Amino acid sequence: MQAKKRYLILFSAGVCLILLFYLQGPASRRTPKRGDDPHPHWPHFSDPLRAFIPWDQTETEDYNVRASPRHKRDDSTGADKCRMDSCFDFELCKRNGFKVYVYPQQKGEKISESYQNILSSIEGSRFYTSDPGQACLFVLNLDTLDRDQLSPQYVHNLKTKIQNLNLWNNGRNHLIFNLYSGTWPDYTEDLGFDIGQAMLAKASISTESFRPNFDISIPLFSKDHPRTGGERGFLKYNTIPPFRKYMLVFKGKRYLTGIGSDTRNALYHIHNAEDVVLLTTCKHGKDWQKHKDARCDKDNAEYDRYDYKEMLHNSTFCLVPRGRRLGSFRFLEALQAACVPVMLSNGWELPFSEIIDWRTAAVIGDERLLLQIPSTVRSIHQDRILSLRQQTQFLWEAYFSSVEKIVLTTLEIIQDRVLQHSAHSTLMWNRLPGGLFTLPQYSSYLGDFPFFYALLGIKPHQKFTAVIHAVTPLVSQSQPIFKLLVAVAKSQFCAQIMVLWNCDKPLPSKHRWPATSVPVIVIEGESKVMSSRFLPYENIITDAVLSLDEDTVLSTTEVDFAFTVWQSFPERIVGYPARSHFWDSNKERWGYTSKWTNDYSMVLTGAAFYHRYYNYLYTHYLPGSLKGLVDQLSNCEDILMNFLVSAVTKMPPIKVTQKKQYKETMMGQTSRASRWADPDHFAQRQTCMNKFASWFGTMPLVHSQMRLDPVLFRDQVSILRKKYRDIERL
């Protein structure tokens, strides 16, 4: 019996061995030997840090190792792999520079107000061209902003309409704007038509679908967002320490089900109703009562007790969680309110991430670490909070306060990609006054701009160039222009004098001009218009420009003192004749006044210093319509320059000394200079004020009550102790 058991055990073991042989043998035989592989792979050594690679990058790592260069090149031609070098024709931009063409609007085609604002911003910019043959970039006349099929703004048959455009060319060199994509319940990023090789300027775009250095992430903005100008940030003054009533706030919808519900449903875990106030409501949508949970009634009641604006303006940090889509209106609201955004939207490509360093203006959180958010924001030092808060105001006013700024920033980014040799530096984008006012075509060296002297630790040039605008023929040696030439030339800081001859009479011979110790360059322009005084002449080799009218009366001491003051404020206009603006509530328009009051908002360029960069900005940034108005009226060029400089700096000009009269009163009445006594001249300046304010979208001029006088000015001390003693006698 025992023998039978032993034989049975041996038989069973043999059967098992045979089964194992047949199961493993074919598998081992199917595995080719190392020398038999017809397509051997490159050896792939395991990465000891592979466990720390984010899950969404592992496929990319394998692709880079396994795929051949030809395979990668073939894949890059797909729409989802587009880059500037593969899906953009640079040849179109070499002929006429960076110009943008907007397709003409078709009859019967509805366009939303937001998309019309986008198109109007492009058409009013310096990039616009009405000739498609000159264009480098094309923008559709079809509204692509809202691609939610449930939206009343949804445009049907868009695919067919786009394919019928004769310049479409599979989207090459085209830019498509989009705010909303996808619909309930998935809210995918599908636009409902094939974008081909077009670039996307899209809100709520994910890092997964974002094509780096090709697409542009823009902020989600409402239909009420202003087209131009926009409100300034709400930060009026800095408080030390920078803490406010609340540490962290949020007020918004709570999605009970579906995408975006996880984070908002969990906010109650960190809400303490004291310094962390995170409020949600279930009252939205048609079927919210069907899905309401046990917390809804309590959440709804608490939600109604708090005022959102009061919370927004009195909180140090503002939570910006994702909604149904990755982007949220709360983002721009927090920026404007100087409430540091705490981003809680994993996978969102932040707006203009290509140029903006968001670490300087926001706290980037992680939805998976929601419970750590309160301790994280509490640990941020107050110096850091103050810096973050100030940067929110800069970014809001520079890039986000209007539709126009969002659109122009988008176009500037694309221009930087096209004209890489003259692209903005990261510093230009992230420091005052921002990339829209710092044109790299002027210079690639930051030291040539008046905004970066302190940052670079340098000073402006120690000399200035005087530019005298002459419109009256030389008749007598007693004319004010001769006295002015002599007085300015005696300044120890004067490098040269330029005379812009805008007179109808022929240019005087050289012997008619007085002898001076500095070079006098006389330039006769081809088009003798008012804007020519602000052209960026190559002859101007100094940073400072002293702009003068031909009938200005200044002494050498006054010139020296004004230049000394300008050296401390090189980004502002510094000079003598002050004017002001006011709001006329009866006429509901802006007014211009030359009355001597206790404040001012303009310093006229008839006797003022400014940086030569503003000549370049005046010529290349301002639209032809404004400069055309100035040339047509032969008036208002000084007001326009003040508008421009104040829009850039957000600060007023600086008046020096108490001098009020700066014009020669004995000019002949037949002279063009006598236009100042013409009543129509003053009325024209009122019109200019409102035309300029309309284009800027706001009133950029800032009032000031500051006047700078020399040390010991009018003090009862010995005249020998005063450096600018002659000023007191004038």
Swiss-Prot record:
The active site is at D638. GO terms for biological process: heparan sulfate proteoglycan biosynthetic process; protein glycosylation. It catalyses: 3-O-{[(1->4)-beta-D-GlcA-(1->4)-alpha-D-GlcNAc](n)-(1->4)-beta-D-GlcA-(1->3)-beta-D-Gal-(1->3)-beta-D-Gal-(1->4)-beta-D-Xyl}-L-seryl-[protein] + UDP-N-acetyl-alpha-D-glucosamine = 3-O-{alpha-D-GlcNAc-[(1->4)-beta-D-GlcA-(1->4)-alpha-D-GlcNAc](n)-(1->4)-beta-D-GlcA-(1->3)-beta-D-Gal-(1->3)-beta-D-Gal-(1->4)-beta-D-Xyl}-L-seryl-[protein] + UDP + H(+); 3-O-{alpha-D-GlcNAc-[(1->4)-beta-D-GlcA-(1->4)-alpha-D-GlcNAc](n)-(1->4)-beta-D-GlcA-(1->3)-beta-D-Gal-(1->3)-beta-D-Gal-(1->4)-beta-D-Xyl}-L-seryl-[protein] + UDP-alpha-D-glucuronate = 3-O-{[(1->4)-beta-D-GlcA-(1->4)-alpha-D-GlcNAc](n+1)-(1->4)-beta-D-GlcA-(1->3)-beta-D-Gal-(1->3)-beta-D-Gal-(1->4)-beta-D-Xyl}-L-seryl-[protein] + UDP + H(+). The keyword Endoplasmic reticulum applies. Disulfide bonds join C636-C688. One of its GO terms (cellular component) is endoplasmic reticulum membrane. The keyword Membrane applies. Keywords: Disulfide bond, Endoplasmic reticulum, Glycoprotein, Glycosyltransferase, Manganese, Membrane, Metal-binding, Signal-anchor, Transferase, Transmembrane, Transmembrane helix. SUPFAM superfamilies: Nucleotide-diphospho-sugar transferases (SSF53448). InterPro entries: Exostosin (IPR004263), Exostosin_GT47 (IPR040911), GT64_dom (IPR015338), Nucleotide-diphossugar_trans (IPR029044). Glycans are attached at N314. UDP-N-acetyl-alpha-D-glucosamine binds at R533, D549, E550, D551, E637, D638, R685. Pathway: Protein modification; protein glycosylation. The chain crosses the membrane at residues 7-27. Mn(2+) binds at D551. Its EC number is 2.4.1.224, 2.4.1.225. It is a single-pass type II membrane protein. Belongs to the glycosyltransferase 47 family. This is Exostosin-1a. It comes from Danio rerio (Zebrafish).
